[in-house]
Amino acid sequence: MPHNPLIFQKSQKYFSRDELARLPVYRNGPEAEAGWDNLVEQVRALMESGTPPEHEKARELAIRWMTMLVFDTNGDPRLAAKLNHMHENEPSLQAHIGISLALRDYVLRAFSETKMLIYEKYLSPGEIRFMRANYGKRAMEWPQLMADVRDAIDEGITPDSPQGAELARRWLDLFRSYAGDDPGTQLKFRKALENEPDLMIGTWADEALLTFVRQAMSRVVQLN
């Protein structure tokens, strides 16, 4: 049970008892809560000082933030998606914990920058411009999609099933939103993912999830 009564109250609305038992952030003690409070204050200070999210310090804090968030959601994108939903829909909680939507978006932009800097090593100037114009626009859709893939895996749904194909199409749609439709460009992004383990830091995309998606997408491509 969290030490904070408001967090306890709000969590009951969005999570089942089983989910709360699997949610480390719900069981955080004073030391972990203090760690979050300190990180939030550092990020807020940067944002309020006008430091752009692309700045090195902002990127460092964003990586810490997302790494802690993955840990505190037990690496489960379903818990992350619900936590996002709770945060977005509870203004009193935002105010209480000091994480406004603007602060969250600042972190997401800084975190996106850490990934784009890696991808840039593989892309042409034109591809970089397209990626930078579109990369963060649909970032908040990824946790729910990964949650749906995780549900499919746990339910025994196979990648070559109709449900697997639908998940693959949704994944491809999000991927193309920043990679574009050129197969050559898409191959560059996939090459980066193969070569750059840092692209997976602070995400909920484990190997089982990625294997399912790769197999499902391969099946969709064959059918087309």
Model-assigned labels for residue ranges:
Residues 1-224:
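Amphipathic alpha-helical "stalk" segments
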